């Protein structure tokens, strides 16, 4: 028997082209995390680009906060089936980070690594060409810790578990290495428009 709510109902025509299959729209911003929210001290915060264990470039908070900023308005989609439209973010584009660091990606893949030990894998192509940023502000204010502040990865065209909270490094990998949820049955890519939620989804 269908449950009350979105299941079994078509989305309104005005949002149908923005709402991936199996999703429902929310005006809230649900908080879903692996564990307790880590306390990240800005005085000791550091973000790095790494090739395996070798650092290629790194920034303190003061240095990172002085980098060129970009604003984005994007829809976001969680694997738990909620979508939120027109979210406003500000941060440093991955393209700009690579350019400022003077590097070309040495591999085709990387792992985003977080201060709480979380990791998730991404193809480089999904981070460049204006598709992703390290976000430090949301809705005109500093990014709250519960939503990944002081800085999180934002990859809005993939399910939101790929937008790692409390990010501390992007580590280039020689192959597509599974991260935390990918090792536990989540899809290696996570395209919401193809409903790539779990291993075995097309």
Describe the predicted segments one by one.
Residues 2-202:
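Structured, non-membrane catalytic/scaffold regions adjacent to prosthetic-group chemistry
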């Amino acid at each position: 028997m269908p449950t009350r709510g979105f299941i079994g109902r078509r989305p309104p025509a005005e949002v149908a082209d923005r709402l991936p299959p199996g999703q429902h729209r929310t005006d809230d911003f649900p908080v879903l995390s692996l564990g307790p929210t880590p306390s990240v001290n800005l005085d000791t915060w550091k973000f790095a680009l790494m090739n395996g264990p070798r650092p290629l470039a790194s920034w303190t908070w003061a240095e990172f906060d002085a980098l060129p900023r970009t604003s984005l308005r994007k829809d976001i989609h969680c694997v738990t089936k909620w979508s939120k439209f027109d979210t406003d973010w500000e941060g440093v584009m991955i393209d700009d980070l690579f350019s400022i660091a003077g590097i070309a990606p040495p591999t085709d893949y990387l792992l985003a690594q977080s201060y709480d030990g979380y990791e998730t894998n991404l193809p480089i192509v999904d981070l460049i060409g204006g598709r992703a940023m390290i976000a430090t502000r949301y809705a005109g204010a500093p990014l709250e810790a519960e939503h990944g502040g002081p800085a999180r990865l934002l990859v809005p065209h993939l399910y939101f578990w790929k937008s790692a909270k409390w990010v501390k490094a992007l580590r280039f990998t020689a192959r597509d290495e599974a991260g935390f949820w990918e090792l536990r049955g989540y899809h290696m890519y996570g395209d919401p428009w193809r409903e790539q939620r779990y291993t075995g989804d097309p």
